[in-house]
Amino acid sequence: MKKGYRNAIFVVVYSKKENKIEYLVLKRKHHWTGWEFPKGGININEKKEHAVKREVMEETGLKVLGVKKFNYSGKYRYKKKFVDRKGLIGQSFSLYAAKVKKGKVKVSKREHSRYKWLEFEKAVKKVRFNNQKKSLRIVNKWLSER
């Protein structure tokens, strides 16, 4: 069987009210434990912007008000094999930001256990992996310049 990378999106979810920006982070419980932002695979023939809106709704219950694509992508290898990822050795991703209205989050119980709205400095310390930290920095820089 040919092994490959799952085509996916990273979505930095944010809420902006006046000059206050907060980022949504989720506590992962499926495959590994730690904090992250919404992410997920892109379905066959699905446009990436649609995948962004779908993943945010599935993982948080929040409606996306706006989407921004960034010129940042990458890939990483899984540290172990997953039953639900047969034939895949890792994930390739493209970065997006999704603006939402801050509200009560309905986390996907299968994947996450909790959520937090955090300002940038706390959010960047909270997320686990360097590619997620870099993603937050990119989005925060863009938002700070607007």
List where the protein language model places each region.
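Conserved N-terminal beta-strand and adjoining loop/helix that marks the start
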Residues: 1-23
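Short, well-ordered beta-strand micro-motif
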Residues: 13-15, 27, 95-99
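Conserved Nudix-box catalytic region and its N-terminal flanking loop in Nudix hydrolases
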Residues: 20-63
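Short aromatic/basic micro-patch
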Residues: 36, 90, 117
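Active-site segment of metal-dependent pyrophosphate-handling enzymes
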Residues: 61-104
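NUDIX/MutT-family hydrolases
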Residues: 94-99, 104-137
